[in-house]
Each structure stands twice: as structure tokens, then as C-alpha cells.
A protein has these predicted regions:
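Domain-length accessory/inserted modules outside core catalytic folds
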Residues: 1-30, 37-148
Length: 148
């Protein structure tokens, strides 16, 4: 496995966000990437799950819109605040774009909760490729998201 500590840290952020209900598809502040950046930069959330005191800049580089199938990518916007936010995660903007697309484009399911869970499973699939995880590690990672 490539960079286990980085993988474990990312997984912990996503599990905590999911179990604490601070993970929201379609919200750049609180999606999978938004949570990773917020945790990395110690950004707090308000009651509407918006960042306090920081603008969302990373979505100027890439974003997956609900009404479009293709992801919008603007690599020329990878500067300033957007660069700082993306770099804080330890992933490249291309890797984060893959995670974000997987999260937002996951199968809907019957409920919002099921859609969120499907999104997280899709992110774990992307992380397993980035970190070159074996099947056993991937299955164990997915099991962390089961709510009791």
C-alpha cells in the first residue's frame, strides 16, 4: 500500500463527516473534498454546513454539477487560495477531482442516506487506486462506514 498514513487520515476525515452528518452531496463546503480541505486547514462549519471565515476556492479548479454529466475542469485556476486548499489535503487536484466526481456521481439509491453511502463507497474505490490498496484493506475501509 502506498502512503498508509495519508490514506488512514483521509479515511478518518470521511468516516467522521459521515457519522456526524456533516457530509453533503452538492455542497462544496461539506462534500467529500470540502470535508477533507476543512479538516486539513482546521476550518469550522456553521449550522448550514458552510465554512466560517474562508471562501470555497477549490471548486474553481474542478466541480461536478448536478445538471451536467461531465466534470468541469479549469486547471488554469489552480492558483492562490484554490492551490492552498487543494495542496492542504496532500492530494493533487486531479486526484481530488476523481474523488469528487465519484462522490457526486454515485448511484442515487432509494434514499438520500443510501446515495451518500454509495458516494463514499465510490470515493474508497478511488482511494484504493491512488494508494494501491489490496482487496482486504479496501473491504475493511468500507466497513468503517456502516452505521450501527
Amino acid at each position: 500500500m502506498k502512503n498508509k498514513e495519508h490514506f488512514d487520515r483521509t479515511l478518518k476525515i470521511l468516516v467522521n463527516a459521515y457519522l456526524n452528518n456533516s457530509l453533503v452531496q452538492g455542497n462544496c463546503h461539506a462534500c467529500a473534498v470540502g470535508n477533507m480541505i476543512a479538516a486539513s486547514l482546521d476550518i469550522k462549519y456553521d449550522q448550514d454546513l458552510k465554512w466560517i471565515g474562508r471562501p470555497v476556492a477549490w471548486s474553481q479548479v474542478f466541480v461536478t454539477l448536478n445538471y451536467k454529466i461531465a466534470q468541469v475542469k479549469r486547471p488554469w485556476a489552480y492558483t492562490g487560495e484554490a492551490r492552498e486548499q487543494i495542496n492542504s489535503t496532500g492530494y493533487s487536484w486531479q486526484e481530488l477531482a476523481r474523488m469528487e466526481y465519484a462522490f457526486e456521481r454515485a448511484p442515487r439509491g432509494k434514499t438520500k442516506e443510501e446515495h451518500m453511502f454509495n458516494g463514499l463507497m465510490a470515493v474508497v474505490e478511488v482511494l484504493s487506486q491512488i494508494h494501491e490498496m489490496d482487496e482486504k484493506t479496501k473491504v475493511a475501509a468500507k466497513e468503517l462506514f456502516f452505521k450501527i
